[in-house]
Amino acid sequence: ILDFYYKLCSLSSHFKYAVIVTGIPDTARVFLYYAVLIIWICAHIILINKKIDAVCFVLLVCVLTGLRYNINSDMKIAMLDVGQGDSIVMHTKEGMNVLFDGGSTSKKNVGRYTIYTYLKYCGVRSLDYVFISHPDKDHVNGIYELIELCDNTFEIGTVVLPGISRAAAVKKQADDDMSKLEMILKNAGINVVYADAGDSIKSGEFSVECMHPCKGYNYESANDYSAVYLVEYGDFSMLMTGDAEKKAEKCIVEDVNRIAGDAGESVRF
């Protein structure tokens, strides 16, 4: 019987939402849980009333269910400590979770023990978008681990890669690293899109616009085609530059100045 019960539990745990990812609940919800639990125990011992038992049980289930809902009143940005590397997570008040890069060359298993642990701490069971600037280890090796950790309690929606022209490759290593990344994503069944300058996504007040690379950009290294994203949320803006180098920065400045000129603005960078 115990063996059958174990196998049944193991089987059911693979279904989506079979496991509730609560994250770390706030003090008020922890207090509410214990308050209901104590009232239930006291009512059961003193009153021995089945109706009160039933009411307390329903309240306890409601409290436990509510533990998994973390409401953000504003956008939250977390710059994770990954050592020599980069990993930034954004949570919007609409409930979108976005990751910009995730890797390190100074910390081992940064995906499992830093990024994934942080997401579980926040009660996040899915990343809507993962923006990868370029496939260098200090920006992507943690994402490989996140892909391996995908299960019924965690999933990755869409991965955004820089839209580079393969025919323009000068450094073979840069091309090989990108091909490896694409193959891993394809085998994992994760949706992949490519962003060129001007492409954007928007959700409520939150938007991400690709500033680089331009379509057909001739790159010389992985850093050279590093995607640059402009994140905007209301009056707040943040430029995610990855490892963009001087050539890429010059290209972005020229594009911005050209657009400003077309719009009749006198501002120059």
Model-derived features with residue positions:
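Non-globular, low-confidence helical/coil segments that flank catalytic cores
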Residues: 2-269
